[in-house]
Amino acid sequence: MKNIPSKYKKLRIGLIILGASTILSSNFFTSINTAYAESGKDSELPKYTLPEGVPTNYNVLWNDEFNGNELDQTKWGYLYSSFDTRAKTQMHFTDKPENVSVSDGVLHLTARYSPTREKWNSETNQMETVPRTNTRKDKDGKVIEEYPAPFTSGAIQTVDSNGNVKVAFKGDYYAEARVKLPMSESSWSAFWMFGTKYPDWPASGEIDILESKGYDPNYLQANVHSPFKVGADYSQQNAKRIPNNGDTQTDFHTYGVLKQSNKMTFFYDGKPVHTVDYNKLNVKTPFVDPDNTMALRFTHIVGGSFLKDGKNSPRDFTDATKHIDSYRDGSRSDMLVDYVRVWQPEETTTEDSTTTTTTTEEPTTTTSTTTEEPTTTTTST
C-alpha cells in the first residue's frame, strides 16, 4: 500500500462554478480500484491510501468528511416529502434533525415512525393533524390509490430543492462512500448517482452504487438504469451475497464505482464485484454524453416493492407498518455515512505549468418539488 497526497494543484480538470452549479470533470481516461481514508478534515487535504497497482495520478477532487455539526448546504440539498410511490414506499423525507443530522464525523439518515403530520385547512384557516399518507398515480397523473405512509426519513443530494445543481461530475472518476447500514427490516438504503441533463427518469441515467435490504445484511445490489427502449430491458442489475457474515449493519464498509469511457466497475471494500460494458446497455447515451453530469444522492427509504423477499416467500418486508417497533426511536433505523469522496485523474502539465479547463455551461436543473402536500417523485433507485 502507498500513501498518495490529495492535492488540487496540477489537476488539469474542469472546475466550473456558475452561480449554484459546480461541474467537475476530466478528459483523461485511466483506471482506479478504490481508496481508503486515514485521517483528516476536508480543509486539510489529508493523505489517502491506495491499493498497489492503482495509478498515482488519481486525486480527491471533491469530498465531504461530515466533520461539522450540521449538513454542509454548500454541497448538499434535502429531498422532501414522498418519493418513488410507484414502488409503494411509505415515508416522507424531511430536513428535520431527527431525520438528517451530522455528529461525531458521521452523517445520519434516520427513519422514524411518525404516523401524523400537520396540514393547512383552507376552510378553517388553521393547521390540523392528519394521517401521513402517500398517493400512487398512473403515467397520466390519475390517482390509483392513497395508502398509509406513517414514517419519516432523510435523504440528501448534490442538487437543491429547486433543482439547482450544486456539484456534478463528468468524464472519468471514482466515487466512494463509507457506510454503515440500518438494521430495520423494511429499510431500503441507497448510495447512487443520477444524470442532470435529461428531465425524466430513466432518460437521465442512474448509477446505483449501493442498494440494500434491511432484513438481509448480506445483500448488496449495484445497478445501472438507462433510457427505455422498445423490446429491451432498461436496467442492468446485479445482486451479490457478500462474504462478511452480515456485518454491514454493525460495521462500516466502502462502496464505490469507477466510471470510465466505455464501462463502469462497482466495488465493495476495495474489491471489484460487478462491471457494466456500455455497449451491452440498450441505450448508453446518459453515460457517454459529456453534458450529462452526474449528481450524488443518499436515500433511506422505508417500505416498497424493492424489499420483496423473493418469489412466494411467506415473509413480507414491503409493508413497513408490520415492523413499526423497529422505527420508534431510531436506534435500529439509522443509516450512517462516514465520508463520500470523488477522485479524478491528474493530467501531465506543460513545462510552464499552464492548465486547461473544460468549456463553461449553464447551470443544470432537475425536477424537485417542496410542498406541504406529499409530492410524488418518479425517480427510482
What is each model feature region?
Residues 5, 23, 265-267:
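Conserved short hydrophobic patches within well-ordered secondary structure
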Residues 9, 24, 29, 356, ...:
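Intrinsically disordered, low-complexity serine/threonine-rich segments
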Residues 38-356:
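GH16 jelly-roll
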